[in-house]
From Swiss-Prot:
Modified residues (Phosphoserine): S10
Pro residues composition bias: residue spans: 104-122
Stated role: Core component of the 3M complex, a complex required to regulate microtubule dynamics and genome integrity. It is unclear how the 3M complex regulates microtubules, it could act by controlling the level of a microtubule stabilizer. Acts as a regulator of the Cul7-RING(FBXW8) ubiquitin-protein ligase, playing a critical role in the ubiquitin ligase pathway that regulates Golgi morphogenesis and dendrite patterning in brain. Required to localize CUL7 to the Golgi apparatus in neurons.
Stretches assigned to the Fibronectin type-III domain: 517-615
Subunit architecture: Component of the 3M complex, composed of core components CUL7, CCDC8 and OBSL1. Interacts with CCDC8. Interacts with CUL7; the interaction is direct. Interacts with FBXW8. Interacts (via N-terminal Ig-like domain) with TTN/titin (via C-terminal Ig-like domain); the interaction is direct.
Subcellular location: Cytoplasm; Cytoplasm, Perinuclear region; Golgi apparatus
Disulfide bonds: C33-C84, C149-C209, C267-C319, C362-C412, C738-C788, C829-C879, C920-C970, C1011-C1061, C1103-C1153, C1195-C1245, C1558-C1608
Name used for this protein in its record: Obscurin-like protein 1
Pfam families for the chain: I-set (PF07679), Ig_3 (PF13927)
Lineage: Eukaryota, Metazoa, Chordata, Craniata, Vertebrata
Tissue specificity statement from the Swiss-Prot or TrEMBL entry: Expressed in granule neurons, with levels decreasing with neuronal maturation.
Residues annotated as domain Ig-like: 12-100, 128-225, 240-330, 339-425, 720-800, 804-891, 902-982, 986-1075, 1078-1165, 1176-1261, 1266-1351, 1355-1442, 1536-1628, 1702-1798
Organism annotation: Rattus norvegicus
Keyword presence, Zinc-finger: no
Length: 1805
């Protein structure tokens, strides 16, 4: 495929989508994406549908195809979804990402107490925080390294260091590590410095400082890289390599690799000091680069990995390890196997600048060979960045817009995985980029390194767009490191290093470590000890879990299936389960399991069961009850368990087998209840004589009693609780109700402070507790303040009586009046009361009567008259009556302007076949207009309609066409209105297919994709996988009417993909899948063949498949074969082979070659061949041995079952006499156990007895051994105590025995003594020499010996790790440790205090662990403070122990409490010490125990309980003890309002009042009423009332529209829905309609009287509904309904109907027509031009009248010359194509009226 670009380009495509971003408020947020397209797309950013523009905080950086959105100082309002929209000429694409802005953590509140100064920064109570972290370093070998960290936190954290996940003392060679604590840092916090003296290459690695205290753990890491100093100048590559290592002593191993594959070498080296590793190739040191990776694996092995091997990589690779004790080598010879098919010209390494381009070029042997490009293991697809070009045999890869991450290894691959490799180097600010990806196990350390061109520059590390903290970043010169210690799954993501516009990215992947759950406890046992308890014991799991764990104990009642958790235990051992732990009495079983963070172990069930009984205790006892006479008395108590009890009243047992009972007939009634742990006794309606009754409760273990006290209840008002405001209209019934707490208690009513007197208009009633004042028909004078007074308390009512509101009867709608200058305008408003006050307003100002404005009144009708209206009189008029208004809009048009609308030019855009209407409004309804199009008068037709309606003139195009575009004029006299119509084609739509189509085809099938459009001539474009297709022989594009087709005549699998048919405004999608043809076996033709071969021999099975690329699988006897040296599989073109190079009889069987669709079977049989000697054992000829030495002669036959015979010098050899004959498979062996001189000669092994049978001979020579002697002498040695001593000598012959003696005693090998034999060299090694090992060492061989003297010098016992000052708190355990340079003998060191030996006891103990000596002080006391020392014979170290008194701390702090009014609150805290006395305070005032305040303490726990709380109790609760003070907040909230009783369903009659009522739990609360989910608002018909806790909703004059669902809501409480049903009133007609006859132009009035005044009616004329307005006026006067029809017309004749509900009345209206007259006549004289059109027009008095047109007295007939038109009252005569002969007199006859016009014609013919 050649690179090319189409003319149309490619639509935008997102290569990388923006990622969601989470930032803290005030930080910087950045979104990035990569978009490609041709031409380069325009990128816009949007939020909430609005395009974003650059500002001070918002910018849009671009870098080639990378586009970004940078938001500085992010605010919470900036959060949301941001859309990146890319658009070019070829299409559009978009992507979205969310930005989340988090609020910054709130600052810690400052302590209220000023007694203690605030702690220094970083040392506040809490988890450790790193103030200063270690910094990564790059040093030369031998340099000193100092890693320092400083940590804050309280309590002071414990610090320790790790290297590569191991503690420093676990590192093999850590003698040069020194830890220096510094607890006196000036800026606070703990500090621990790691100092490495004379750094070595093995010291390279990741160092992590851990900080841990009771509140948590923190860690920070740094990278240390130790480099070899550059001692020699760089070598000229043309010079031969200089040997830097010793020659190898043995032949290296050989390793073969195919070209383009990876080679991996691994060596494992041990030594002390830890050895330094170097890799060499052909003697030259290797350095890591892009294709050579050097690292150390998790098992400690050193690995060299050569990527994508090439021919130049062949050679000898050596791993050299050296330390101060010596060096060792390991080598391997690498051979690179080159493929047969090779690149004609391979790739060459290239370099390029960042943001530039590079070109990689190679040549293939044949232009038809397909190739693929890779960047390392990632396949590269063609795009704008990676342009792939094929020109003949040349293959090019052009990389555009280079970035740091483009640096790497690139490959071009042919078939057969033949590759050519090249390096691409990107020059820029970043020299060494990050790896593509990094895989790290969970918990390991992750290290990322970047090298920059300039030193000292500041880069930025981020993960998934979020900047990483500075504690894990380090920079030194050109190197930048990111160290992530102990990675977790949350650390995974895309890590980026940015430097200006350059960046490099890696994908950090964290692999989870699978942890096993802990094991179960063992040795579980149950002991039934004391009564009502059970003892459970167990042992910890084996092996114990690695992490912390607990034990979970569960119980199960026998007979139940449910297990219930009892409690959790941290330590193993025993636990006693009392009966109080179970809810009810029963037999219980128990089980236990181990739980840790890694899961739960299986349960272990304790054998047997235990019977447990819960013991009842009194949790909350009985209390004396005081109630009023007639109320219920409730006694209750709470027990600790569910148990039955008995109630007593005055010593008499109350029956509890019934829900209710009675002490005795006619006496006190009671009710007993039990809910769970609570028992209640309710004495109902107690009387005064029950005063002093004693109530008791008894159950097993509990007995309690209380007394009943009854008081005479004072009278009080139950309702209303507050003042009631009531509003009524005159004649309404008013009822004021006051409910008292006592029955028949007297009360007095007052009005305005005066006692009321009963009369017919005011009635006072008393009914039980309720007292009522009734006004049967309220009047305005009854308004006032009413009071119901009794026993000094009162209920108040404010009553307001008003006249009923006035309503406007007509008009009900907005009235629009149009008039011309000097016309009379009348505005009429009718109200329902004649005495109502009416006010008129114009444009908001009240009008006053004058010469130009006349105000009239006629009964309920009020009029405003403009006798001679002027344009300035127009405006907005209002008729205001009470709260109602009627609106009139008056428009006065000057005669000079006939066209009211439109005022300017109108532009109409339409789509073909749409309906277009042009509207022109005139000032008068009888005015005539003329319509023209592009200067020509239009003619009415089905395609063009002219309409006239009152003052409106319309031109209608029912189905507009393209040719209808143009300018239309509506002309009248000298005025015109202009309309410009533009008609366009409708957008193209795809009719078929509507959904995505999926097609499946087989190779070479014809695939047709069809798309049907809404337009025949619409163009389309076809795309495949986002690229526009081009028509070729393999892809044909067709067009047939509205159908468009894409045809693949012979589809191939690569033709599959997503096809898109793009019609501009619409697209259709097709998914095509083309599968390969069936895979067949074309040779052999037979499907089963029988083949025979010799064994052993070469067997080859061969098949040919079609197509040639088909995959096959081979089977033997039903099992798939595996490739090995004995079985090889081959494939070349269509041929597939299976080869057995050395077939044996056992290889016979059934072989099957199987493709996806076919198979062929080979039945292979193997016959044995004659016996042959395959190979003798590798022995010299002749074989020379010494007497007594064993001899073994061996050979191998071609068949294991063959028989052989042995002979010695021609004589048969027999078993025995020191000779042994053996057969081991195909091998035949002759063994001589101890050779002597008689065994010299020729030994022959012959197969078979036939003459000429194959044979094999061996020549054995037995000779005397050479004498044994020592060749070299031992050397005297002097070593230090603890070092190794090595004695070495050489012996001849090499196999001679050597005996070692020490001080004359034979040496026996052991842990300290080691003897080494290597050729002729003999070595004795004495490990860890001690002073007692000094003496003489002797080596003896044969008759010779040699001796040397060993001297052992005593080593000084010095302290490597010295004592450190320790600060401790009284009662803690303190440990002092030192580390010596060697392991000293017991008692080699001694401990001191104050310079004196330290006496040891149970609190002071010492211990030694190798090099470490430890002093332990358990439960340190204040007297233990002082100076402690540790000394040996050669060294001494001192440290100071400081002990501070035990401080009081809170282990569990106080917590804020929120309760409701009347509730109780409990505050509890736990201190670090017992027996502490503290004080509780509220709002700074000390609290003392009382009825509402309970204070108690138990051990370290202190508790405060406050009950009966009110709103005023909110505030600060504090606890003070010694120097400790802690506080919490108490918040008391109001009890939320609830709805006690909601509204009920109602059914009312239309016109009546509906009242909904609900009752609340509180008096002062606002209620919202809703109807059908919508809140209701006040209106004249809707009133709201509040009566104490009752809330009323009153709906007056209900109609059917009021029906629906009503509910009330208060706060969060909502009542259930209540349904209002409005019944229709039964209406009957009292006064029927009367038929009328009237003349045209007169008025007609119809009246109908019905039985109900609140009924609405409906009027009809001729079956058509009538509505007020124009000539129709409708009004209602009580029960009378009136219809007035003015300006009658003949067409008004018909039946008049009035209907009110089911009632109906009919009448007949007859309208007599007036004689037809002309209202407007034609001009007496009219002049027209020749060839033009003449129009004569008249207007008659009524529409439908007939007129007659005549010329010179002769009636004209319609035709092509004359056209008669009629529209309403207008009649026209149109004379077409006027000629001179058309001159004359034209007459129009309308009834008895006529008019003449003289037509004059001007112009030449």
């Amino acid at each position: 495929m050649k690179a090319s670009s189409g003319d149309q380009g490619s639509p935008p495509c997102f290569l990388r989508f923006p990622r969601p971003v989470r930032v803290v408020s005030g930080a910087e947020a950045e979104l990035k994406c990569v978009v490609l397209g041709e031409p380069p797309p325009t990128v816009l950013w949007e939020k909430g549908g609005q395009q974003l523009v650059a500002s001070e905080r918002l910018s849009f950086p671009e870098d080639g195809a990378e586009h970004g959105l940078l938001l500085s100082g992010a605010l919470p309002t900036d959060a949301g979804v941001y859309v990146c929209r890319a658009r070019n000429a070829a299409g559009e694409a978009y992507a979205a990402a969310a930005v989340t802005v988090l609020e910054p953590p709130a600052p810690e509140p400052e302590p209220q107490s000023s007694e203690c100064p605030p702690p220094p920064p970083g040392t506040g109570e809490g988890a450790p925080v790193f103030l200063t972290g270690p910094q990564s370093q790059w040093v030369l070998r031998g340099a000193e390294v100092v890693l320092t960290c400083q940590v804050g936190g309280l309590p002071e954290p414990k610090l320790y260091w790790e290297k590569d996940g191991m503690a420093l003392d676990e590192v093999w060679d850590s003698s040069h590590y020194t830890l220096e604590p510094d607890r006196g840092a000036s800026d606070g916090g703990a500090s621990l410095t790691l100092r490495i003296l004379a750094a070595r290459l093995p010291d390279s690695g990741v160092y992590v400082c851990h900080a841990r205290n009771a509140h948590g753990h923190a860690q920070a890491g740094a990278l240390l890289q130790v480099h070899q100093p550059h001692e020699n100048p760089p070598q000229d590559p043309d010079e031969p390599p200089v040997r830097v290592i010793e020659p190898l002593k043995c032949a290296p191993k050989t390793f073969w690799v195919n070209e383009g594959k990876h080679a991996k070498f691994r060596c494992y080296v041990m030594g002390k000091p830890e050895p330094e590793i170097e890799w060499h190739l052909e003697g030259r040191p290797l350095l890591p680069d892009r294709r050579r990776l050097m690292y150390r694996d998790r098992d400690g092995g050193f690995v060299l990995k050569v990527l994508y091997c090439q021919a130049k990589d062949r050679g000898l690779y050596v791993c050299a390890a050296r330390n101060s004790a010596g060096q060792t080598l390991s080598a391997v010879q690498l051979h690179v196997k080159e493929p047969r098919l090779r690149f004609t010209r391979p790739l060459q390494d290239v370099e390029g600048r960042e943001h530039g381009i590079v070109v990689l070029e190679c040549k293939v042997p044949n232009s038809r060979i397909p190739t693929a490009w890779f960047r390392e293991d990632q396949r590269l697809l063609p795009c704008r960045k990676y342009e792939q070009i094929e020109e003949g045999t040349v293959r090019r890869l052009v990389i555009h817009r280079l970035k740091a991450d483009d640096d790497g290894v690139y490959l071009c691959e042919m078939r057969g995985r033949v590759r050519t490799v090249a390096n691409v180097t990107v020059k820029g600010p970043i020299l060494k980029r990050l790896p593509r990806k990094l895989d790290v196990l969970e918990g390991e350390n992750a290290v990322l390194l970047v090298e920059t061109q300039e030193a000292g520059v500041q880069g930025c590390w981020s993960r998934d767009g979020e900047e990483l903290p500075a504690t894990c970043q380090s920079s030194c010169g050109h190197m930048h490191a990111l160290v992530l210690p102990g990675v977790t799954r949350e650390d995974a993501g895309e890590v980026t290093f940015s430097l200006g516009n350059s960046r490099t990215t890696t994908l950090l992947r964290v692999k989870c470590v699978k942890h096993s759950p802990p094991g179960p406890p063992v040795l579980v046992e149950m002991f039934k000890g004391q009564k009502n308890t059970v003892l459970l014991t167990w042992k910890p799991p084996e092996p114990p879990p690695e992490t912390s764990f607990i034990y979970r104990l569960e119980r199960q009642e026998v007979g139940s299936e449910d297990w219930i958790q009892c409690f959790s235990i941290e330590k193993a051992g025993a636990v006693e389960v009392p009966g109080d732990c179970v809810p009810t009495e029963g037999d219980y079983r128990f089980r236990i399991c181990t739980v840790s963070e890694h899961g739960r172990s299986p349960h272990v069930v304790f054998n047997g069961s235990a019977h447990l009984v819960p013991t009842a205790r009194l949790v909350s006892g009985l209390e004396d009850v005081q109630v009023y006479d007639g109320e219920d008395a409730v006694f209750s108590l709470d027990l600790s368990t569910i148990i039955q009890g008995s109630w007593f009243l005055n010593g008499e047992l109350l029956k509890n087998d019934e829900a209710e009972g009675q002490v005795e007939p006619g006496a006190l009634r009671y009710r007993i209840e039990q809910k769970g742990l609570q028992h209640r006794l309710i004495l109902q309606t107690v009387k005064h004589q029950d005063n002093g009754a004693l109530v008791g409760f008894i159950c097993p273990g509990v007995q309690d009693s209380a007394a009943l006290s009854i008081q005479e209840s004072p009278v009080h008002i139950l309702s209303p609780q507050d003042k009631v405001l009531l509003t009524f209209t005159t004649s309404e019934r008013v009822v004021l109700t006051c409910e008292l707490s006592r029955v028949d208690f007297p009360a007095t009513w007052y009005k305005d402070g005066q006692k009321v007197e009963e009369s017919e208009s005011l009635v006072v009633k008393m009914d039980g507790r309720k007292h009522r004042l009734i006004l049967p028909e309220a009047q305005v004078r009854d308004s006032g303040e009413f009071e119901c007074r009794t026993e000094g308390i009162s209920a108040f009512f404010s009553v307001t009586v008003q006249d009923p509101p006035v309503h406007i009867v007509d008009p009900q709608e907005h009235v629009f009046v149009h008039a011309i200058t000097s016309e009379s305008v009348m505005l009429t408003c009718e109200v329902d009361r004649e005495d109502a006050a009416v006010h008129w307003y114009k444009d908001g100002q009240e009008v006053e009567e004058s010469a130009v404005i006349v105000l009239e009144k006629e009964g309920p009708r009020h009029r405003l008259v403009l006798p001679a209206a002027q344009p300035s009189d127009g405006g907005e008029f209002q008729c205001v009556v009470g709260d109602e208004r009627a609106y009139f809009t008056v428009t006065i048009t000057d005669v000079s302007s006939w066209i009211v609308y439109p005022n300017g030019k109108v532009y109409v855009a339409a789509v073909r076949l749409e309906r277009v209407v042009l509207t022109c409004e005139l000032c008068r309804p009888w005015a005539e207009v003329r319509w023209t199009k592009d200067g020509e008068e239009v003619l009415e037709s089905p395609a063009l309609l002219l309409e006239k309606e009152d003052t409106i003139r319309r031109l209608v195009l029912p189905s507009v066409q393209l040719e209808d575009s143009g300018e239309y004029l509506c002309e009248i006299h000298d005025e015109s209105a202009s309309f410009t119509i533009t008609v366009t084609e409708p957008p193209v739509r795809i009719i078929y297919p509507q959904d995505e189509v999926t097609l499946h085809a087989v190779s070479l099938e014809c695939v047709v994709l069809t798309c049907e459009l809404s337009r025949v001539d619409a163009p389309v474009r076809w795309y495949k996988d986002g690229l526009e297709v081009e028509e070729t022989e393999a892809l044909v594009l067709q067009s047939d009417g509205p159908r468009r087709r894409l045809v693949l005549p012979a589809a191939q699998p690569e033709d599959g993909g997503e096809f898109v048919c793009d019609a501009g405004d619409d697209s259709a999608f097709f998914t095509v899948t083309v599968t390969a043809p069936p895979e067949r076996i074309v040779h052999p033709v037979a499907r089963s063949l029988d083949l025979q071969f010799g064994a052993p021999g070469h067997v080859e099975l061969r098949c040919e498949v079609a197509p040639a690329g088909s995959q096959v699988r081979w089977y033997k006897d039903g099992l798939e074969v595996e490739v090995s040296d004995a079985l090889q599989l081959g494939a070349e073109g269509p041929a597939r082979t299976l080869t057995l190079p050395h077939a044996q009889p056992e290889d016979a069987g059934e072989y099957v070659c199987e493709t996806r669709d076919e198979a062929v079977t080979f039945n292979v049989s193997l016959a044995e061949l004659p016996v042959q000697f395959l190979a003798p054992e590798a022995v010299p000829n002749p074989l020379c041995v010494v007497p007594g030495e064993p001899v073994m002669l061996s050979c191998e036959l071609s068949r294991a079952s063959a028989h052989v015979s042995w002979s010695h010098n021609g004589n048969p050899v027999k078993q025995g006499e020191g000779l042994e004959l053996r057969a081991e498979g195909p091998r035949r062996i002759l063994c001589i156990q101890a050779a002597d001189l008689a065994h010299t000669g020729v030994y022959t092994c012959q197969s078979g007895t036939a003459p000429g049978a194959p044979s094999l001979s061996f020549n054995v020579q037995v000779a005397e051994p050479p004498p044994v002697k020592l060749v070299s002498e031992l050397t005297p040695l002097t070593v230090h105590e603890g070092d190794d001593a090595t004695f070495q000598c050489e012996v001849s012959p090499p196999d001679a025995e050597v005996t070692w003696l020490r001080n004359g005693a034979i040496v026996t090998p052991g842990p300290q003594l080691e003897m080494v034999h290597s050729g002729s060299s003999r070595t004795l090694i004495i490990r860890g020499c001690q002073l007692k090992d000094a003496g003489t060492v002797t080596a003896r061989a044969g008759a010779t010996d040699t001796s040397a003297r060993l001297h052992v010098r005593e080593t000084e016992l010095l302290f490597l790790r010295r004592l450190q000052d320790v600060r401790a708190e009284e009662g803690q355990d303190v440990y002092l440790e030192v580390e010596t340079g060697r392991v000293g003998a017991p008692g080699a060191v001694r401990w001191l205090r104050g310079g004196e030996p330290l006496p040891l006891d149970s609190r002071l103990t010492t211990a030694q662990d190798g090099h470490v000596h430890r002093l332990s002080i358990h439960g340190v006391l204040l007297t233990d403070q002082g100076t402690y020392g540790c000394e040996s014979h050669h060294d001494r170290t001192l440290a100071r122990l400081s002990v501070r008194p035990r401080q009081l701390r809170e282990l569990r702090p106080l917590e804020d409490v929120t309760v409701h009014e009347g509730g109780s609150a409990t505050f509890q805290l736990e201190l670090s010490q017992e027996g502490v006395t503290g004080e509780w305070a509220q709002g700074g005032v000390r609290l003392h125990p009382g009825p509402k305040c309970h204070i108690h303490s138990e051990g370290r726990t202190h508790c405060l309980v406050l009950s009966g709380l009110g709103l005023a109790d909110s505030g600060c609760i504090s606890f003070t003890a010694d120097t400790l003070r802690c506080a919490a907040r108490l918040t008391v909230r109001e009890v939320p309002v609830t709805i006690v009783q909601g509204p009920q369903d109602l059914e009312v009659t239309e016109g009546d009042t509906a009242t909904f009522e609900c009752e609340l739990s509180q008096t002062l609360a606002d209620v919202i009423w809703e109807k059908d989910g919508q809140a209701l608002s006040l209106s004249p018909r809707l009133r709201l009332q509040s009566l104490g806790t009752r809330r009323l909703l009153l709906l007056r004059r209900c109609s059917s529209s009021d029906a629906g669902t009503y509910c009330c809501a208060v706060g969060t409480a909502r009542s259930g829905p209540a349904r209002l049903t409005v019944r229709e009133r039964e209406v009957s007609v009292l006064g029927e309609l009367r038929s009328l006859s009237a003349r045209e132009g007169d008025s007609a009035t119809f009246e109908c009287t019905v039985s109900e005044s609140e009924t609405t009616g409906r009027w009809e004329l001729g079956g058509r509904a009538l509505r007020p307005g124009g000539r129709v006026r409708i009004r209602q006067e009580g029960k009378k309904h009136i219809l007035v029809l003015s300006e009658l017309r003949t067409e008004d004749t018909g039946e008049v109907c009035f209907q009110a509900g089911p009632a109906q009345s009919l009448a007949r209206l007859e309208v007599e027509a007036l004689p037809l007259q002309m209202c407007r006549r034609p001009p007496r004289e009219k002049t027209v031009l020749v060839d033009r059109r003449a129009v004569l027009e008249v207007t008659v008095s009524r529409p439908g009248g007939h007129v007659c047109w005549m010329r010179e007295g002769v009636e004209l007939c319609p035709g092509s010359k004359y056209e008669m038109r009629s529209h309403g009252t207008t009649h026209s005569l149109v004379i077409h194509d006027v000629r001179p002969e058309d001159q004359g007199t034209y007459s129009c006859q309308a009834g008895q009226d006529s008019a003449d016009t003289q037509l004059l014609v001007e112009g030449d013919d």
